[in-house]
């Protein structure tokens, strides 16, 4: 399910003394079954784009096309409910959205809200809980009795239970230890392998290099750079001038190249670096 922004602008609290422009004539495409990353500082427009993808915001100007459905300024139609079902949005610290008395009920709530029967919603909930690594003995527990990592998995299972075609992730591993971070990123990688479109908002450039196949760089509400991660991370000085940085291995390789190591291009993953050394 592809997504396209056509000349999209967004203004918060338009027509009030507090209005602020968040996006300026943004044009971009997110291809079906792609893994697209957005990087940029706070205030660059990343969160606004996330909420436009899901129909939580309506463009002030321009058009957001999700599959065959379009959202334009002033739209208040039934298509937005369809879009919210098909584009799952996982906010930073999604465990803060848990509220039901049991894990199973919490995950089943979303599908039921979209008209799925209780029996089918619970079946979906059980399936998605297993998918994210929550064992059956936890299904009837209060979600607030779980560890932080388990709570986050339950919250993500709640999004997956609505069977979205696109999963939008806002700093999904924030606050997790390295093991928990790796497990969660592997889960998203496996979902992508099964055909789900993944949209990742992150400040971790190593994750962009390891998982994404396309990157948008945002600054002050505009797309300033876009391309494949390999292409984007060759622009070390440009990214550092924006205080965004590059993957650790890319910076290390750049230092070696300045000391005389001959590299055809800067590697962006450890595997690439190893191959470059072997054949260098």
UniProtKB/Swiss-Prot annotation:
The record places domain ABC transporter at: 3-245
Species of the source? Streptococcus agalactiae serotype V (strain ATCC BAA-611 / 2603 V/R)
Q: What is this protein called?
A: Energy-coupling factor transporter ATP-binding protein EcfA2
Give the InterPro entries listed for this entry.
AAA+_ATPase, ABC_transporter-like_ATP-bd, ABC_transporter-like_CS, ABC_transpr_CbiO/EcfA_su, ECF_ABC_transporter_ATP-bd, EcfA2, P-loop_NTPase
Q: How does it sit in the membrane?
A: Peripheral membrane protein
According to the record's subunit comment, the protein's assembly and interactions are: Forms a stable energy-coupling factor (ECF) transporter complex composed of 2 membrane-embedded substrate-binding proteins (S component), 2 ATP-binding proteins (A component) and 2 transmembrane proteins (T component).
Judging by the UniProt lineage, the source's domain of life is: Bacteria
- Keyword Transferase found: no
